[in-house]
Amino acid sequence: MSQPRTRIEIWSDIACPWCYIGKRRFFRALDARADREAFEVVFRPFELDPDAPAPGEPLRDRLARRYGARSEAMMRQAGGAAVGEGITTDWERALAARTRDAHRLLALAALEYGATMQRRLAGLLFAAQFELGGDVSSADELTRLAVAAGMDEARVRELLASNEGEAEVEAGIERAAGLGIRSVPTFV
């Protein structure tokens, strides 16, 4: 009889460079374990900037308005850490964008395809956000990324054209608040 899998939940936001870095570090460590199949990893939603625009705007500009002179140092620090994980951040192209629909899509990936699909999609979303200048608030961009991950295009478009998954995302955000999660990434 096989042992039950240990669930690891990662509260994360696609808008967070430290979440991308943390994802890379975590999965490198997990993948190196002989017992990696004993773990089920699920991404949970967290919105660092729920008022971010859709379509997105230049991340550099939004950070400068929010954090002033500190924003450049923040990007340098995150960019330096990212390089160590094989991530090439492009702060000139990166956009600050609403991530609610990306979270709905990640929830759909987990629910209908499983944790492996969710992990694959999260990687593509993070790369689009920080390396490729993608707008993760755009239904077309989200659809393109989901299809590249292996999800059904019609199903993805159906989700994005509706409010489906909204309650689940909100419940995940409320659960994070109930657990006292105030920063991401957080691993539980």
Model segments located where?
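Short secondary-structure boundary segments
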Residues: M1-S2, L48
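C-terminal cap of thioredoxin/glutaredoxin-like
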Residues: Q3-F39, F43, L106-A107, L111-V188
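Structural alpha/beta surface segment adjacent to cysteine/selenocysteine redox centers
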Residues: K23-Q129
